[in-house]
Amino acid sequence: MRIIFTVLFFFQIFSIFSQDQGVVVNQESVGLEGVTILFVDQNLELYSKDDGSFIIPKSIPDNSLIEIKKSGYITQVIQFKSNENIEIKLESLHVQLDEVEIIESANQLGNTKLVSIEKKVLNDLSTSSLVENITQLSGVNWIGSGLGIQKIVVRGLSGMRVVTYLNGMRIENQQWANDHGIGFTELGLGEVELIKGSSALKYGGEAVGGLLYFKDAPFLESEKLSGFVSTKFDNSHFLSGNKFGLKWSKNNFYFNIYGQYTIATDYRLPDNTYLYNSRFRNQGIKFSASYRSEKTQHIFRYQHNAEQLGIPAHVCDPTLGDIDFSQILSNDLSLSEDYDMSVIRPLQNVSNHLFIYENNYFINNNKFSFYAGHFINNLKEYEKVTYPAFDMDLVSTQLRLNFRKKVNYFTINIGSQATSNSNKNHTVDYLIPDGTSNDIGLYSILDYEKKNLGFNVGARLDYKEVTCDSYNFQNNFSSVSSSSGLFYKYKDHVIRLTYSSAFRSPHLSELFSDGVHHGTNRYELGNSNLDIEKGRQLDIKYQWSSQHFGVILNPFLQNIKNYISINPLDSIIENNRVFEYTQFEKVTISGMEINLHYHPHFMHNLHLEQSYSIVETKNHDTNKYLALTPSNKIKTKVRIDFKQKNLKFLKNISLYHIYSFEQNNVSQFELPTDSYNVVNVDVSCMLLKKIDLLIGISNLFNEEYVPHLSRIKDVPGVPGGIPNPGRSFNINLKYTF
């Protein structure tokens, strides 16, 4: 009797335990260690143990999405069902076409199979900046000067046309100007999702050129305090950066906190001179907290970033003549002086505060989401004096409601979004007057997916009101955006077709600018007669892969009506050339992106990835090309992974090569640029079980080159422009606990 009781007791314990755990195995039914189990709707992750098992957190609602992923295996997305054993068998994946392939994955922006979404994992341990990391994707470039000021360019479009979201909040800063960065760093981020073109309905009412959605790393299901401390040194800028991160959870409470401090001097050119005033400093703190019950989840986030950015290649010359190269370069470097940001001019002081609250409610197959965000941006620009030439506050508040329902193979999203923006000047002189804009959008999206076939269709209506009391101006802008997609898979062939449209209202800077824009050395005039900019895009993606080779072909065509541009005039105001905003009736952007991945059978640890990006632009009004059209590029990455026991400390070696073709397809007011080659090398090691080391060399052959999108390529008196940094090395060290 005692034996029977004991057996029944252990059977009951095992039965209860089995309901709260799952297991991940390979094709041979062997448990897989270190598999990421991401509960998508709860923004919560955990990792499988050495036998492949994992414990399911308590109170996970039925029908919640779970993404199971591990490098070298095909990602799976399943729906959670309580009281059911979870056993996932992952298939080996020899060929992975970076983050551009059409695969099953859970995304904030939509279904990857039905919408043109690309994803990039963001690692705390990286030899490149946040922006440079993203530009490894085909068709993505950056515009800026050095590491301090960088901005994303997608298929030749940037600024107001490429909308940036951070944890659900649209970032409203000086995104209309190329002399300002994106306003935050890689601190605490987990990945970024990218939509190229105008098919972002849920978030992108004005995303004519694309949408970037940055997401924090998920919360961690673990009562043990975990985190990291990392440090980085890059001798191109003599950059010194330090970061930390902590994660902890208990009884359905979750906490993440991150901090960062980075300082950099003027960057070194290939001839060993230094570009004066390209130095910068960045400080950041980020905090997230969450509480979860069976049906509800609350998330609060706060983030603060403070930046001090020098503006290089800026000389106040009342004669408007050529600049002497010696005025913007220096021959030596003094760390004590160059780390001092208080003495340099011109200078930008940027302070950003971001507050976010999210609430999710789950019931049956439904998910209700409420989102509230508040963003405060303060910009001060100093010229040659102690008080700022500009001091402006930009405040943005955003509310969003979304209802998601799953019915068999259908997923329905219905929602609305309201945004209020206002800017206030605190100086007598200003570039943009005080003004407000308020807009509201309504959208509906229907997805259908069954086995190897799927489609989606959606529409969005936006209404925007812009007010500027200084000019006695009030105007309304409204339009409809739409998107539709079709997905089909046959054996190893996958094809997706997407057609979308979007619109963009004129920004305050385009309507009412009237002043010197110090970062660009020009006097800018707005145009209050500007109308809505409308874009339509056709995007086709074909994918084929075998065990050792994969290819993606992605042609696209985009037409933009009433394209807003800024052009020079034949006049001078306050010793600066005058530029005025204008509008072109029709602009066409077309091109092709090709991605290849080769994984030889005889050497399974070798990966060869290559992408080709081709973009052509045409202004039908002038029969010329658009300004700042990126040059065509070939990006090649060769990576060797090491798993041999005698090289246990060595993880991988990678070589990254960019070949940029010459760009002769220029607008009426810009100069062509030459072709160039840049080679970077990274070596990744694990010194101890919890210490990672990454050593890199950038611009290995010390190539002297000026990208066509460089912000400092058209400096008067400097033929060919100012080059990017020369050869440099960087060291990254990270301790994880």
Could you say what each language-model-derived stretch is?
Residues 697-699:
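Gly/Thr-rich phosphate-binding loop signature of adenosyl cofactor/nucleotide-binding cores
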Residues 40-41, 166-168:
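Short strand-turn-strand beta-turns centered on an Asx-Gly dipeptide
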Residues 134:
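Active-site-adjacent helical/loop segments in soluble small-molecule enzymes
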Residues 1-23, 737:
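Bacterial Sec-dependent N-terminal signal peptides
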Residues 17-98:
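Periplasm-facing N-terminal accessory domains of Gram-negative outer-membrane beta-barrel systems
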Residues 94, 101-125, 139, 144-157, ...:
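Outer-membrane beta-barrel proteins, especially TonB-dependent receptors
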